[in-house]
Amino acid sequence: MTILQSYTTQMVLLGTALLGLASGIAGTFAVLRKESLIGDGLSHAALPGVVIAFLLTGIKDIEVLIIGAALSSITAAWLITITVENSKIKFDGALATILSAFFGLGMVLLTYLQSLNNAGQAGLSKFIFGQAATILARDVYITSVAALIIIVLTALFWKELKLISFDVEYAKTLQIPVTFTLILYRSLLIMTIIIGIQSVGAILISSLLIAPAVGARQWTNKLGTMCILAGCFGMVSAIGGTIWSTTVQKLPTGPAIIVILSVVVLLSLIFAPNRGILWQFRKRGAP
């Protein structure tokens, strides 16, 4: 337990805990809107933004890389939207195509950057699978502030986010600013993704965004309870995965967090009352 007494480890745990909490809350609305795959597309799209930001500036500070990731994810979201609206391609087709293109571009740029033997690029590959051990106290501060902003915005616009999650047309009849709320919803997803790629990685951050909500949905039909449960599942998994990756040498943080989160979701799918597999078997076997 000595490693847990380290100030650096405590800061990293704080950052990943808040990230897990924010991810569970933001992902709840994506699951309810049946847009679980949007997180996958936006997270993969963030990678080329990270690399391009470094290529243009030569700076590896998290503030710079986050801006690159955000611009790249926003561009991907915009391309997905205009593709669906102006062609016969459906949402999943546009998402898969743009996801693959952006992530492929990111990998090509990362390979090119590594071939330059630029010492400054060391550590950028950690953005693929994540590595909490490389996070500095300043990075944790930025992550924590962003996570708190996500939580506060969700609380402030709770009614609006709830309505667009279930019935957009009904929200319009109530004079809810639907366009603004949809932009806010996508912004929450993008913000969660860009603050999480350093810890969890571009490949797996979408799982941290969606899986907690999937697990929480098994236990309740109430949105508020679902949000709280999803946040708790994300937070506990993030803490557990961070401790695991910190204590085991060369274990990336992202996979460690997702393995623990997968266990939580699996247990929810099996044991949750009313929706769980065991409960369903019990009901079928009842006379």
Where are these regions (language model features)?
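Cytosolic-side transmembrane-helix boundaries in multi-pass membrane proteins
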Residues: 251-287
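Alpha-helical transmembrane segments of multipass membrane proteins
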Residues: 25-29, 51-55, 78, 82, ...
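Hydrophobic alpha-helical transmembrane segments
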Residues: 13-18, 63-71, 96-97, 140-145, ...
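Transmembrane helix-bundle core of multi-pass membrane transporters
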Residues: 98-154
